[in-house]
């Protein structure tokens, strides 16, 4: 109820504020709603007064702000999560030990080569038992 009364009061105030004291000059060929005539009517006077344009823009900004404030609590943003403050600020240390760099740039022959990581996918042939 309070929101409705406030909204009606704003509309009444804007309509009283935006009512022109003298009739604006009307140019039928340059209407505000005919966007395709903008290049030819750029310097012409609009059929809508500037006060009405400002009022329309103000109402649109007000409505979009209210909509954004209504939607914001339902957004799942990272910093609003319950466990957002429980995450570490620095990454965990590497699980694999770093390899020692030898002066010559190669691994000596007596050290085994590092094993290749296992593939993440399963081969079709391993599932069927061969290449039938």
UniProtKB/Swiss-Prot annotation:
Annotated TM spans: 51-75
GO biological process annotation, one example: regulation of signal transduction
Single GO cellular component term: host cell membrane
Highest taxon listed in the record's lineage: Viruses
Topology versus the membrane: Single-pass membrane protein
Protein's cellular compartments: Host membrane
Keywords tagged on the record: Early protein, Glycoprotein, Host membrane, Membrane, Phosphoprotein, Signal, Transmembrane, Transmembrane helix
Post-translational modification: Phosphorylated on serine; O-glycosylated, but not N-glycosylated.
Coiled-coil features, chain-numbered ranges: none
Position of the signal peptide: 1-18
Family, similarity comment: Belongs to the adenoviridae E3_14 family.
Annotated function: Down-regulates the EGF receptor and prevents cytolysis by TNF.
UniProt protein name: Early E3B 14.6 kDa protein
Taxonomic path: Viruses, Varidnaviria, Bamfordvirae, Preplasmiviricota, Tectiliviricetes
């Amino acid at each position: 109820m309070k929101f409705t009364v406030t909204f009606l009061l704003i509309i009444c105030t804007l309509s009283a504020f935006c009512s022109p004291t003298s009739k604006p000059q009307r140019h039928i060929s340059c209407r505000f709603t005919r966007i395709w005539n903008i290049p030819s009517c750029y310097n012409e006077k609009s059929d809508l007064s500037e006060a009405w344009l400002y009022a329309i823009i103000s109402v649109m900004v007000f409505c979009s702000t209210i909509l954004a404030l209504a939607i914001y609590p339902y957004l799942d943003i990272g910093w609003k999560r319950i466990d957002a403050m429980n995450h570490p600020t620095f990454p965990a240390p590497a699980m694999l030990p770093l390899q020692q760099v030898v002066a010559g740039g190669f691994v000596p022959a007596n050290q085994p080569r590092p094993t290749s990581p296992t593939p993440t996918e399963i081969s079709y042939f391993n599932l069927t038992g061969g290449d039938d």
